[in-house]
From Swiss-Prot:
ATP binds at G387, E388, P389, D411, T412, W413, W414, Q415, T416, D500, R515, R526. GO terms for cellular component: cytosol. Mg(2+) binds at V537, H539, V542. InterPro entries: Ac_CoA_lig, ACAS_N, AMP-bd_C, AMP-bd_C_sf, AMP-binding_CS, AMP-dep_synth/lig_dom, ANL_N_sf. PROSITE patterns: AMP_BINDING. Its EC number is 6.2.1.1. This is Acetyl-coenzyme A synthetase 1. Belongs to the ATP-dependent AMP-binding enzyme family. One of its GO terms (molecular function) is AMP binding. Acetylated. Deacetylation by the SIR2-homolog deacetylase activates the enzyme. Its cofactor is Mg(2+). CoA binds at R191, G192, G193, K194, T311, N335, S523, R584.
Length: 651
């Protein structure tokens, strides 16, 4: 399929949208010409305790990076997500919890959620947690995790959610960095039929003497498994809730008070504690959730992410609840008990909007029509994609098979550091190009620069930067502002550097070509790994592909491809040659893979991102310098890839 395919805006989408093409153009223009006026107006969508006077006070100067929005205003996030909805929709369902086991589900109304949050906020205070203290949340995808997040915001504590798949070492590092006072966890997590010993992992993490800031562990009962207990330190969630009072006034917080820390892996060294603050983040989360998904009251919204990632923070919890939405919290994985799980959940809860990741889409696509066998799917109105660029083939499959060729797709591009979507087509405003993140959201000013930082105009490819601040932007890295400046503002002076490369086409649409450190340079030709991967996945027998550079005596860099075949397809030398020719035909001779290695599985983080760093090391036979693989979803994959690589070397 050519990258130039254009899917026009659906008439149904235009008929019901908040933002048609003309509205987008007018609002976008206003947002970049007069950001103060634009955001002053948009900020009225949330409740303020003390209204702000100042709107935007921001500097990207690398000697003085300082980002403040609505700084003299005060508010409370939990009030905005709960209390203000009670009069109108107290009995509406706020959270639909869908357990790992399809038989488990629970509905929690706004009134019930409000009561639980007030109780747990009081319980936290009883454990000596106060404004400005950091609470680490290491939990499965259960309602208590959302209650814990909102309870922190109610009393002004800062939460740091750590994904439940991270190892004790990774957890300890994240506790030490922010000097956490309390850890909230569960006896075990359940995911894809497997149990994770969360409480045991916390115990293990806390054997590190540097975690001495932790005073208490609060434990939810998820499976009832036997766990070790330290009576001086450990306390049951249920015991606290039984005695907690159900009224708790929300704490008045400054717009620039910290809301949460979320750790994201640095390409080197220790994880970065990305810090988001209260006012700007909530305004931006709420506005993007409404406009990107054209969210209307009463709709059922399902973002499949984990709350351990920024997507879960912004589009399971804060955006939807600020907007009074019904949001789905899914404990499981898309292919358990079988590959029809996503389709079944859509029908069971009459989901209107589905927001998921390319890795989940490709897993379904590998099973073909079986993924939606027997499903109705008619409740769906809009699809979304997040996490990495989606290859055009996967986009098209998602559009035709899951969305029945009638649901627009919002292919959103953003980062932990950006708080919420920065680029996406809007369903009622922009024709869709499969694989393109399309246009910037309101207030976002993207640009392409060459390696010297010179702006490139028109249709071109380069480093993607953002020229001015937006309210959802991270303010710093916790405890390390210098690293924040060095990472994002030093490379290109006066600009926020995203770390991504991008191409802008003749229509002004943006195409993310992958991390700049994932760029291949083959005989002087720059090529994004995403481009080669897309071509490979376009082959009918290929489920997934990961491309890395390898040293090549003649070309400088060669192209090394790891290929996962569709179920039922056998690898062979003939197929290997066929795939090489296929990519050559799709992109050109310069993109012909030098090596194809069959890979039944790829090393992925728990959020589904492929760890190309590990793949580069294996391709170079540097097996003993792989670094930390504890954060992988399935570390066993690595050993298999090493053995295959060794046998290829020997052959």
């Amino acid at each position: 399929m050519s990258a130039a395919s254009l899917y026009p805006v659906h008439p149904e989408a235009v008929a019901r949208t908040f933002t048609d093409e003309a509205t987008y153009k007018t609002m976008y223009q206003q947002s970049v010409v007069n950001p103060d006026g634009f955001w002053r107006e948009q900020a009225q969508r949330i409740d303020w305790i003390k209204p702000f006077e100042k709107v935007k006070q921001t500097s990207f100067d690398d000697h003085h990076v300082d980002i403040k929005w609505f700084a003299d205003g005060t508010l409370n996030v939990s009030h905005n997500c709960l209390d203000r909805h009670l009069a109108e929709r107290g009995d509406q369902v706020a959270i639909i919890w869908e357990g790992d086991d399809p038989a488990d589900h629970q509905e929690i109304t706004y009134r019930q959620l409000h009561e639980q949050v007030c109780k747990f906020a009081n319980a936290l205070r009883g454990q000596d947690v106060h404004r400005g203290d950091v609470v680490t949340i290491y939990m499965p995808m259960i309602p208590e995790a959302v209650v814990a997040m909102l309870a922190c915001t109610r009393i002004g504590a800062i939460h740091s959610v750590v994904f439940g798949g991270f190892s004790p070492e990774a957890l300890a590092g994240r506790i030490i960095d922010c000097k956490s006072k309390v850890v909230i966890t569960a006896d075990e997590g359940v995911r894809g039929g497997k149990r994770t010993p969360l409480k045991a992992n916390v115990d293990d993490a806390l054997t590190n003497p540097e975690t001495s800031s932790v005073q208490k562990i609060i434990v939810c009962k998820r499976t009832g498994a036997e766990i070790k207990w330290n009576q001086h330190r450990d306390v049951w969630y249920d015991d606290l809730m039984k005695v907690a009072g159900s009224t708790c006034a929300p704490k008045e917080m400054g717009a620039e008070d910290p809301l949460f820390i979320l750790y994201t892996s640095g390409s080197t060294g220790k994880p970065k504690g990305v810090l988001h603050t209260t006012g700007g983040y909530l305004v931006y989360a709420s506005l993007t959730h409404e406009r990107v998904f054209d969210y209307r009251p009463g709709e059922v919204y399902w973002c499949t992410a984990d709350i351990g990632w920024v997507t879960g923070h912004t589009y399971i919890v804060y955006g939807p609840l600020a907007n009074g939405a019904t949001t789905i919290l899914f404990e499981g994985v898309p292919n358990y008990p079988d590959v029809t799980r996503v389709a079944k959940i859509i029908d069971k809860h009459k989901v209107n909007i589905l927001y998921t990741a390319p890795t989940a889409i490709r897993a379904m696509m590998a099973e073909g029509k079986a993924a939606v066998a027997g499903a109705d799917g008619s409740s769906l109105r809009l699809l979304g994609s997040v996490g990495e660029p989606i290859n055009p083939e996967a986009w098209q499959w998602y559009y035709e098979t899951v969305g029945q060729s009638r649901c627009p797709i919002v292919d959103t591009w953003w980062q932990t550091e950006t708080g919420a979507c920065l680029m996406t087509p809007l369903p009622g405003a922009h024709a869709m190009k499969p694989g393109s993140a399309a246009k910037p959201f309101f207030g976002v000013v993207p640009a392409l620069v060459d390696n010297l930082g010179n702006l490139i105009e028109g249709a071109a490819e380069g480093n993607l930067v953002i020229l001015d601040s937006w309210p959802g932007q991270a303010r710093t890295l916790f405890g390390d502002h210098d690293r924040f400046v060095d990472t994002y503002f030093k490379t290109f002076k006066g600009m926020y550097f995203t770390g991504d490369g991008a191409r802008r086409d003749e229509d002004g649409y943006y195409w993310i070509t992958g991390r700049v450190d994932d760029v291949l340079n083959v005989s002087g030709h720059r090529m994004g790994t995403a481009e080669v991967e897309s071509a490979m996945v376009a082959h009918p027998k290929v489920a997934e592909a990961a491309v890395v550079g390898m040293q090549h005596d003649i070309k400088g860099q060669g192209i090394y491809v790891y290929v996962t075949l569709n179920s039922g397809v056998e690898p062979s030398e003939a197929l290997r040659q066929e795939l090489k020719q296929w990519v050559r035909r799709e992109i050109g001779p310069i993109a012909t893979p030098d090596v194809i290695q069959w890979a039944p599985g790829l090393p992925k983080t728990r959020s589904g991102k492929i760890m190309r760093r590990i793949l580069r090391k294996i391709a170079a036979a540097e097996y003993d310098t792989l670094g930390d693989i504890s954060t992988l979803a399935d570390p066993g994959v690595v050993q298999h890839l090493i053995e295959t690589h060794r046998s290829m070397q020997a052959a």
